[in-house]
């Protein structure tokens, strides 16, 4: 089953069961045994790491993907974008290192909306972002990821974290509760 058939309607995920794994053009498929080094990105890996975004519950997901051939990785992402673009989803490599890529799968329209709120714009401007468009902000984020070893903390805004929580984390405030992320303002 391909990702294109997993998605339906307004982006809802239906029965996320991957029964086949796509391989890169070179023919190298993802290693399927637990603990085996993955040699390529697969649709299964995308579904496992990005189900909340594919289901329309989040703006974006981020995951690391080992790879052996850069061109195969980029070909796979182009193919994925041809299929997912129809559903309003896009995948981009934010950082590519020697044998590992950091992939961001997101909903561009939702990212545009998320980053256009006043509190997001103010927070991002502190880090040199010009938030007149999600693609510009993504370009700046990718540049920051390449320039520094640590993750830029504003990345939470690209992953559907509330701006108040990202700001609270940056200011080292005491959190009110911990779940999938630390909550600093509204616990609900």
Residue map of PLM features:
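A structured, charge-rich N-terminal accessory region that forms the first stable segment of a protein
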Residues: 27, 33-97
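Helix-hairpin-helix/helix-loop-helix acidic hairpins
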Residues: 133-149
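Accessory, usually C-terminal, subdomains that scaffold auxiliary metal cofactors
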Residues: 176-188
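Short, surface-exposed beta-edge/turn micro-motifs
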Residues: 58-60, 99-101, 152-154
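Hydrophobic/aromatic-rich, well-ordered segments within soluble, folded domains that form packed cores
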Residues: 151-176
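A glycine-rich, hydrophobic loop/mini-helix early in the fold
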Residues: 75-133
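Gram-positive cell-envelope targeting signals
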Residues: 1-31
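Short, surface-exposed acidic
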Residues: 130-135, 163, 178
């Amino acid at each position: 089953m391909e990702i294109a058939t997993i998605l339906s309607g307004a982006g809802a995920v239906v029965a996320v069961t991957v029964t086949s794994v796509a391989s890169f053009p070179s023919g190298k498929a993802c290693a399927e045994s637990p603990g085996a080094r993955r040699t390529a990105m697969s649709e299964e890996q995308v579904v496992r790491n990005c189900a909340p975004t594919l289901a329309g519950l989040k703006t974006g997901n981020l995951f690391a993907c080992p790879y052996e051939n850069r061109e195969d990785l980029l070909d796979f992402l182009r193919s994925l974008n041809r299929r997912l673009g129809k559903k309003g989803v896009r995948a981009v490599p934010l950082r590519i290192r020697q044998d590992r890529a950091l992939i961001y799968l997101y909903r561009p329209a939702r990212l545009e909306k998320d980053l256009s709120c006043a509190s997001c714009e103010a927070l991002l401007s502190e880090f040199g972002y010009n938030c007149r468009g999600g693609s510009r902000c993504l370009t700046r984020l990718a540049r920051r990821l390449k320039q520094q070893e640590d993750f830029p903390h504003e990345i939470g805004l690209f992953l559907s974290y509330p701006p108040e929580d990202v700001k609270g984390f940056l200011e080292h405030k005491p959190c009110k509760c911990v779940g999938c992320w630390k909550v600093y303002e509204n616990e609900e």
